[in-house]
Amino acid sequence: MPPVVKRLGRVDYQPTFQAMQDFTASRTAETPDEIWIVEHPPVYTLGQAGKPEHILRDVGIPLVKIDRGGQVTYHGPGQVVIYLLLDLSRLKIKVRELVTAIEQSVIDLLAEYGITAERRDGAPGVYVGEAKIAALGLRIRNGCSYHGVSLNVDMDLSPFAAINPCGYAGLKVIQTKDFNIPLTAHEAGEQLSQHLLQQLDQKNG
């Protein structure tokens, strides 16, 4: 059974994070997988490996410490975030395979618009040249994933300048708008979720 796709619109980060934890903690072997498509109001999230020194200055944006892997990143309007609540044991997918599938979904989406993107060893996410266009972070609990991937579409990128994105000082961050791709965050979410479903179907095939 393919995951149930839920379009939650623009929602605050903290209750969404709590809902992911609650869903994962309460799911059973029969619980259908879900994919949530969201946007968030401005928020920084600090992963388990996050170091306070990667937050360079206070710009009045709230910071939430969370349990995904990785360092600090920014979410805001005009960026699509897709959360993958998957039973990896049931799907027979390893964590590394899921990361690769997520990255490939973004790469395939951008390729449809003539953009050549790539992954990097040891630095999860998707890059165009030297700049990062998508970030990902996951948590696995009892063989089930939550958290997911964010793709910069048409947003104010300036809050990234107040952090070392994903722990990398001076990392340039870009968005699809920079390539004159006529996408809204909503449209990008719809298209990216379809690529994710295709990748998961291939992995599970």
UniProtKB/Swiss-Prot annotation:
Pathway: Protein modification; protein lipoylation via endogenous pathway; protein N(6)-(lipoyl)lysine from octanoyl-[acyl-carrier-protein]: step 1/2. One of its GO terms (biological process) is protein modification process. Residues 29-204 form the BPL/LPL catalytic domain. The active site is at C166 (acyl-thioester intermediate). It catalyses: octanoyl-[ACP] + L-lysyl-[protein] = N(6)-octanoyl-L-lysyl-[protein] + holo-[ACP] + H(+). The record marks K132 as: Lowers pKa of active site Cys. Signal peptide: none annotated. Pfam families: LplA-B_cat. One of its GO terms (molecular function) is lipoyl(octanoyl) transferase activity. Its EC number is 2.3.1.181. InterPro entries: aa-tRNA-synth_II/BPL/LPL, BPL_LPL_catalytic, Octanoyltransferase, Octanoyltransferase_CS. Keywords: Acyltransferase, Cytoplasm, Transferase. The keyword Magnesium does not apply. Belongs to the LipB family. In the reaction, the free carboxyl group of octanoic acid is attached via an amide linkage to the epsilon-amino group of a specific lysine residue of lipoyl domains of lipoate-dependent enzymes. This is Octanoyltransferase. The gene is lipB.
